Amino acid sequence: MSITSDEVNFLVYRYLQESGFSHSAFTFGIESHISQSNINGTLVPPAALISILQKGLQYVEAEISINEDGTVFDGRPIESLSLIDAVMPDVVQTRQQAFREKLAQQQANAAAAAAAAAATATSTAATTPAAAAQQNPPKNGEATVNGEENGAHAINNHSKPMEIDGDVEIPPSKATVLRGHESEVFICAWNPVSDLLASGSGDSTARIWNLNENSNGGSTQLVLRHCIREGGHDVPSNKDVTSLDWNSDGTLLATGSYDGFARIWTEDGNLASTLGQHKGPIFALKWNKKGNYILSAGVDKTTIIWDAHTGEAKQQFPFHSAPALDVDWQNNTTFASCSTDMCIHVCRLGCDRPVKTFQGHTNEVNAIKWDPSGMLLASCSDDMTLKIWSMKQDACVHDLQAHSKEIYTIKWSPTGPATSNPNSNIMLASASFDSTVRLWDVERGVCIHTLTKHQEPVYSVAFSPDGKYLASGSFDKCVHIWNTQSGSLVHSYRGTGGIFEVCWNARGDKVGASASDGSVCVLDLRK
């Protein structure tokens, strides 16, 4: 048996990624030199650290259950071991001794009962339920009258999976599960003009899935392998694909990777150009509406505007003092960026300083989004607040405090001024590690609905194109569809892995979701 520090570090790194601690994972990866190890991450299955810990725990429990002569105790352990208990020798020895004493007591009781039975063989049998119960106590593991199991239990801090109402549950016939990725799928996005779904994964590939009705009944996939040049050859980068975005006419797909490169692909899967100027992983990238520029944010503390036609960097913006986490265009040449430095900068192509800087968050700013009119900027943070900013003032317009844990992402509804649904009020959705989604009336600065069916952190929210529905995805493996006016749950689907991303197609009749177990699912919401 051999265990190297590189192997341990890699499993810890993957655990941090899979658990949503992306910033911690990045920092740990740098300090432990993960990128310099020779471990092929695409071959390591999801949840590998948990799996090996469970096996180790089972080994310790088996060790407790074996006699000194090698024979196995006949019975179950008194109580399931926790992971912390298993690494404490005193606890293990105490459990082992208690187990032996309990078995000795059971054997003594059995012998006494046998003797008593022999002595009273001619007595009348007990007829009352209480007496019968006393004579036949439930064995460890059998159910008692009230349905509770006899004996002690391991404590589970997670709630049981919520029962899904049959009226809202999406049947398997309406769910298509797309398999092919060999690692967790961090992101997915529909083509804006056709039913092509793009996905990005930890297996160093993006994929384009054809879900159009005329695609021969099934779904075909194009594999977009992210390679780097080594010794004159293209070799897999073995780095996560963590961001992707279609241009507005659906002809090109941009991807961002932990290998530090952004790439542009055609819709038929051919690599059009590679954009290389970041010094480290890319956390976010976005096309502008016109389709001539791509914007990227990197761990190197910079943001870059790229010329989509030539692949050249038009301008690099080095204003953050820590990794840049998200970017969003206000118009075709002006954008906002946020960072772990707690600041938000608004920058413009051609300007060598930010045109505006917003300060007020007291922890990392995870996401930023301009409203459809480009007048208001929303931001969310690990400080548990959601803030609304205007270019007309320095202080935030609203400081919305209701979540009890970090807010991971936010989305504006496609309603109100400057949208195709101008007669509907604009809303803002926020998704948090407190397992809730909140819908906000931004004009009044109040929470309209708190959506509480999820049992684990919520990583993604997305509005339907008409703004009438909101999809949410959580690490509890569930995708929920909500009515935005009433706040009621209208559809629900339980997948096979924690949900990292949800997205709607352009018609608003399909929802895509990407998961931690490598699956991508498509939910057909047509009647």
Swiss-Prot record:
Localization of this protein: Nucleus
Domain F-box-like: 41-86
Any GO MF annotation of the entry: transcription cis-regulatory region binding
Effect of residue 326 to N: Affects recruitment to heterochromatin by MECP2
Effect of residue 382 to A: Affects recruitment to heterochromatin by MECP2. Does not interact with MECP2. Is efficiently incorporated in N-Cor repressor complex
InterPro entries per record: Ebi-like, G-protein_beta_WD-40_rep, LisH, WD40/YVTN_repeat-like_dom_sf, WD40_repeat_CS, WD40_repeat_dom_sf, WD40_rpt
GO biological process: fat cell differentiation; negative regulation of DNA-templated transcription; positive regulation of transcription by RNA polymerase II; proteasome-mediated ubiquitin-dependent protein catabolic process; protein stabilization; regulation of transcription by RNA polymerase II; response to estrogen; response to steroid hormone
Tissue: Expressed in the cochlea.
Positions bearing N6-acetyllysine: 102
Cross-link (Glycyl lysine isopeptide (Lys-Gly) (interchain with G-Cter in SUMO2)): 290
A GO cellular-component term linked to this record: nucleoplasm
Domain LisH: 4-36
Residues found modified as N-acetylserine: 2
Disulfide-linked positions: none
Residues of the signal peptide: none
Region of interest called Disordered, as start-end residue ranges on this chain: 127-164
Comment, domains: The F-box-like domain is related to the F-box domain, and apparently displays the same function as component of ubiquitin E3 ligase complexes.
Function of the molecule: F-box-like protein involved in the recruitment of the ubiquitin/19S proteasome complex to nuclear receptor-regulated transcription units. Plays an essential role in transcription activation mediated by nuclear receptors. Probably acts as integral component of corepressor complexes that mediates the recruitment of the 19S proteasome complex, leading to the subsequent proteasomal degradation of transcription repressor complexes, thereby allowing cofactor exchange.
Family in the record: Belongs to the WD repeat EBI family.
Oligomeric form and interacting partners: Homotetramer; dimer of dimers. Component of the N-Cor repressor complex, at least composed of NCOR1, NCOR2, HDAC3, TBL1X, TBL1R, CORO2A and GPS2. Component of a E3 ubiquitin ligase complex containing UBE2D1, SIAH1, CACYBP/SIP, SKP1, APC and TBL1X. Interacts with GPS2 (when sumoylated); leading to protect GPS2 against degradation by the proteasome. Probably part of other corepressor complexes, that do not contain NCOR1 and NCOR2. Interacts with histones H2B, H3a and H4. Interacts with MECP2; recruits TBL1X to the heterochromatin foci. Interacts with USP44.
Protein name in the entry: F-box-like/WD repeat-containing protein TBL1X
